[in-house]
């Protein structure tokens, strides 16, 4: 199993850079940030955006994989996203992973629109978003005429350091999203039970995870892909609780998640208060174990 850390972009860089550098020193396989203008409880608090954060993190680190969980149609057109992704991947020396999701409803998604998207429109936009972003990152010139997105002879020079493009980590819970992950994803991303914001013991997430993994594998078979070629990434966000209560809890959770089919286990950098309250000392103790032999 691979282990990752997600860092809330709330700190000024002189503080944040220490977390990103420490994540690499701790031995995590990948480190992630959020892609929002504001987010939930942080609406009236300090919040920095994903592109400059990842750019700075790319300069600050050397080995660790870097990514966003997740970019969505809420914030930017695929043409602008693709250009930023290519630049960050270059600065990072080919370490970027692009997380993509349909985007949550709420104030973050309506700041620049008069009316919110319907669920159907959001799903349609996400499908076009993934397909167009894929084309923009794979080929030097792209023309695309979709229902929601247009690209007219967009020149993508240079292409990504990683070929044929940066890996996609596609967040999905429904049938259409699972199919997108099966078609385009190097990773499939889940937070456990969809739309659950109340914390629950991590054991309670296992039945949902098993069902979701089964749905992903079915989608892979339907599109003619070997299910084993798609990594399964779990973000332990608000709904999956208790994983950093102790090192024992962390590795117990990792073992249970692995048995459910998860390959990548991402926890939140502990904060002094909710959300994601916890002790950095526990994370440090977990890190001490990461290089030791274990069953997971």
Question: Can you say where each PLM-predicted feature lies in the sequence?
Answer:
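Active-site-adjacent structural elements that line small-molecule/cofactor binding pockets in enzymes
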Residues: 1-296
């Amino acid at each position: 199993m691979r282990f990752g850390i997600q860092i809330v972009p709330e700190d000024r860089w002189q503080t944040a850079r220490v977390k990103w550098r420490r994540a690499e020193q701790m031995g995590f396989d990948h480190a992630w940030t959020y892609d929002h203008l504001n987010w939930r409880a942080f609406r009236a608090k300090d919040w920095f955006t994903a592109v400059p954060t990842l750019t700075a993190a790319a300069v600050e680190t050397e080995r660790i994989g870097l990514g966003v969980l997740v970019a969505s149609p809420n914030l930017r057109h695929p043409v602008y996203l693709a250009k930023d992704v290519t630049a960050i991947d270059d600065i990072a020396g080919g370490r970027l992973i692009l997380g993509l999701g349909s985007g949550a409803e709420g104030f973050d998604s309506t700041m620049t629109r008069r009316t919110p998207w319907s669920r159907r429109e959001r799903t349609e936009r996400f499908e076009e978003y993934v397909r167009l972003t894929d084309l923009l990152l794979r080929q030097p010139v792209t023309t695309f005429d979709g229902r929601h997105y247009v690209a007219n002879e967009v020149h993508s020079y240079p292409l990504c350091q990683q070929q044929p493009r940066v890996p996609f980590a596609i967040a999905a819970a429904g049938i259409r999203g699972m199919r997108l992950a099966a078609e385009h994803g190097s990773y499939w991303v889940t937070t456990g039970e969809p739309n659950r914001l109340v914390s629950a013991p991590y054991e309670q997430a296992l039945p949902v995870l098993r069902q979701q993994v089964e749905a992903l594998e079915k989608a892979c078979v339907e599109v003619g892909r070997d299910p084993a070629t798609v990594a399964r990434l779990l973000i332990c966000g608000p709904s999956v609780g208790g994983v950093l209560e102790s090192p024992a809890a962390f590795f117990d959770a990792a073992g249970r998640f692995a048995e459910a089919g998860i390959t990548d286990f991402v926890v939140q950098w502990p904060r002094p208060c909710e959300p994601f309250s916890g002790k950095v000392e526990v994370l440090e103790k977990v890190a001490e174990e990461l290089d030791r032999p274990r069953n997971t």
